[in-house]
């Protein structure tokens, strides 16, 4: 839903937001459902969105099950600097794709944190954690799996967005 097919998947998204309590997949109560968009397995949310939007914005097509082998994602998308100078330095196509990625990230967490059910997030998701497109980092260098605290500082606006959504959920 977040990275494409919005109109085709709106009914499924509504059912998910309501924790599948009404309809053919009724699970009972919201507390029985974990809502998430990324976990420690597979791509991080940021990497998945980079792959999806790089494909759509840069001219190729998004394959089913996007991963690092299906889309050639420019490294600059993973390392994105969202300052005006940073976006100006990557060219208009990549800057547009990065803006779409950030908007989709916010939509994804907005859906997760305002949905019925128990929210779950990958550590570092709040600052656009990346494993640079690696969908299976189990045997990778430890630096790939570490949390990048410099990135957290650089993406503090996104952290603030997550914090506001968490506060809204608590209220």
Describe the residue ranges of each PLM region.
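Active-site-proximal helices and loops of the catalytic beta/alpha 8
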Residues: 1-28, 127-164, 168
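Conserved alpha/beta catalytic core and glycan-binding cleft of carbohydrate-active enzymes
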Residues: 1-121, 127
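A glycine-rich beta-turn/hairpin centered on an aromatic-Pro dipeptide
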Residues: 171
